[in-house]
């Protein structure tokens, strides 16, 4: 896989082309990603680069984490992320920023979707509601039957039912990079990306890029 970067969702806006076409974009702040470890096949069995981003108070860093960051001689960040590599070399302390992307490139953006709490089947799985009238009472938003009788005598795994919705890992694929602002460490991506404003995002070159 090709290396990506970790960023923070700033929100959405729009920009205009020279022809006056409005393009909705998500603004992603790409703070410099600090390399904390470079893994090789000889030492770890695979090639990867491990990065951290942002800052974290010393009181919020465990002793094990503090030792790991100190060994790499980098400041403690708000998390640790890893990218598999097929080629390229990095050293602890190297910086990776938004300049690895270019305008017009397609990227995959991964984040944690907004949590919706406990949701019914209509909101969670787009079930249709039952009749409002015609003899129906107190069953307008219920899912209906969830299985058969004695055979098989159980509810199949994976049955779509009510439950916790959102707050899960989501990847949106093949979004176009509209603009790269290297001075302000900003990446403008066409369309919406998962998660709330301020959430962590992982931006990688598109795995299924067309052409």
Curated annotation (Swiss-Prot):
SUPFAM superfamilies: Translation proteins (SSF50447). The keyword RNA-binding applies. GO terms for cellular component: cytosolic large ribosomal subunit. GO terms for molecular function: rRNA binding; structural constituent of ribosome. GO terms for biological process: translation. The keyword Lyase does not apply. Transmembrane segments: none annotated. InterPro entries: Ribosomal_uL3, Ribosomal_uL3_bac/org-type, Ribosomal_uL3_CS, Transl_B-barrel_sf. Methylated by PrmB. It comes from the Bacteria. The modification N5-methylglutamine is found at residue 150. Keywords: Methylation, Ribonucleoprotein, Ribosomal protein, RNA-binding, rRNA-binding. HAMAP family: Ribosomal_uL3_B (MF_01325_B). Belongs to the universal ribosomal protein uL3 family. Part of the 50S ribosomal subunit. Forms a cluster with proteins L14 and L19. One of the primary rRNA binding proteins, it binds directly near the 3'-end of the 23S rRNA, where it nucleates assembly of the 50S subunit. This is Large ribosomal subunit protein uL3.
């Amino acid at each position: 896989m090709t290396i990506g970067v970790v960023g923070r969702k700033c929100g959405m806006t729009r920009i205009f082309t020279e022809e006056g076409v409005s393009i909705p974009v998500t603004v992603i702040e790409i703070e410099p990603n600090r390399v904390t470890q470079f893994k090789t096949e000889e030492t770890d069995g695979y090639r990867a680069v491990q990065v951290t981003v942002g800052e974290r108070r010393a009181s919020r860093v465990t002793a094990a984490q503090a030792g790991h960051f100190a060994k790499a001689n980098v400041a403690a960040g708000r998390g640790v992320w890893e990218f598999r590599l097929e080629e390229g070399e990095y050293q602890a302390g190297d910086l990776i920023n938004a300049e690895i992307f270019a305008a017009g490139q397609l990227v995959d953006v991964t984040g944690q979707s907004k949590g919706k709490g406990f949701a019914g089947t209509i909101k969670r799985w787009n079930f249709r509601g039952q009749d409002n009238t015609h003899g129906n009472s107190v069953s307008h938003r219920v899912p209906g039957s969830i299985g058969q009788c004695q055979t098989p005598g159980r509810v199949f795994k994976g049955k779509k039912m009510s439950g916790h919705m959102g707050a899960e890992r989501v990847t949106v694929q093949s979004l176009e990079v509209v603009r790269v602002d290297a001075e302000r460490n900003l990446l403008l991506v066409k369309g919406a990306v998962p998660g709330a404003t301020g959430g962590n995002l992982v931006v990688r070159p598109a795995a299924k890029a067309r052409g």
